[in-house]
């Protein structure tokens, strides 16, 4: 299976949301990384066939998804940032309702609802109302509904926003587990969501694709540019004024700074191996990282 994004652009009035995006996807997890407003959601909505591009096209095995229409949508599982749910429905009833909308027979729906509830570890909560679920449970029901039609292409937009670390890890592991024979597109501004599971990472900024590579290859441009340094309290503000300081950790009466700099920021600075948090700051240091 091959999914191709061919020179896709999208504008809203005079504002350009995406500019000339070209990509190719096969099975595996692809992380789409960018700050808020970078064009991630617009890109995901176009690939999910929820929104039409202003120019360019998306192809599945060489065929335009606009021409495939419902045949393409049958292959899609989509989890948007906000999933509309009926709060008085139980988890089981909600999933059965969505299964009916997706055209599953009653027998098929019952079997599939049981399967996805088990997959997202919510079988014991099947009779509980979704309106009383925690944020993590709500996101898991969201991914469950996206999987009801056994999609070949799974598109999830900012799935872990607002979740605690335990739920984020659970969700990340679930996506990794189901990606063996699917294309999984995961958009996020939380680096740790994709660092361990992404086959490739796409970096979007201002609606443009600025990098696309494996996590290891993405880090090469900042090798030798990440430093750690112990300073006293007055040194913290001094180095923050001059350099990109990614992290500050207190160690007894001193502070350890993690600095991104083309040159050695201080004779005592020690070179460190870069990670994707460093990469994010390298590209989005002017953005607010949530």
Regions found by a protein language model. Give the residues of each.
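Helix-to-loop junction immediately C-terminal to a conserved catalytic motif
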Residues: 48
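Conserved ABC transporter NBD signature motif
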Residues: 56-67, 71-72
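Walker A (P-loop) phosphate-binding loop of ABC-type ATPase nucleotide-binding domains
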Residues: 35-39
């Amino acid at each position: 299976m091959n999914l191709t994004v061919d020179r896709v652009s999208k504008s809203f009035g005079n504002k350009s949301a995406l500019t000339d995006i070209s990509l190719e996807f096969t099975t595996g997890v692809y992380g789409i990384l960018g700050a808020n407003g970078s064009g991630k959601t617009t890109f995901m909505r176009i690939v999910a066939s929820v929104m039409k591009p202003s120019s360019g096209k998306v192809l599945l095995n060489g065929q335009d998804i606009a021409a495939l229409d419902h045949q393409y949508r049958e292959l899609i599982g989509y989890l948007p940032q906000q999933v509309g749910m009926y709060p008085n429905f139980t988890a089981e009833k909600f999933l059965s309702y969505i299964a009916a909308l997706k055209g599953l027979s009653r027998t098929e729906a019952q079997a599939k609802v049981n399967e996805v509830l088990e997959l997202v570890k919510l079988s014991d909560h099947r009779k509980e109302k979704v309106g009383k679920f925690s944020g993590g449970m709500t996101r898991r029901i969201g991914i469950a509904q996206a999987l009801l039609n056994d999609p070949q292409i799974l598109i999830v937009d900012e799935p872990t926003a607002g979740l605690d670390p335990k739920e984020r890890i659970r969700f990340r592991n679930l996506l990794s587990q189901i990606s063996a024979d699917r294309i999984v597109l995961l958009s996020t501004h939380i680096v740790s969501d994709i660092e361990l599971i992404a086959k490739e990472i796409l970096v979007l900024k201002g609606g443009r694709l600025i990098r696309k590579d494996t996590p290891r290859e993405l880090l090469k441009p900042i090798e030798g540019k990440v430093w750690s340094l112990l300073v006293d309290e007055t040194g913290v503000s001094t180095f923050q004024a001059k350099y990109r300081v990614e992290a500050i950790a207190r160690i007894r009466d001193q502070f350890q700074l993690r600095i991104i700099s083309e040159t050695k920021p201080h004779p005592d600075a020690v070179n460190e191996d870069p990670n994707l948090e460093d990469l994010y700051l390298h590209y989005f240091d002017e953005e607010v990282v949530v």
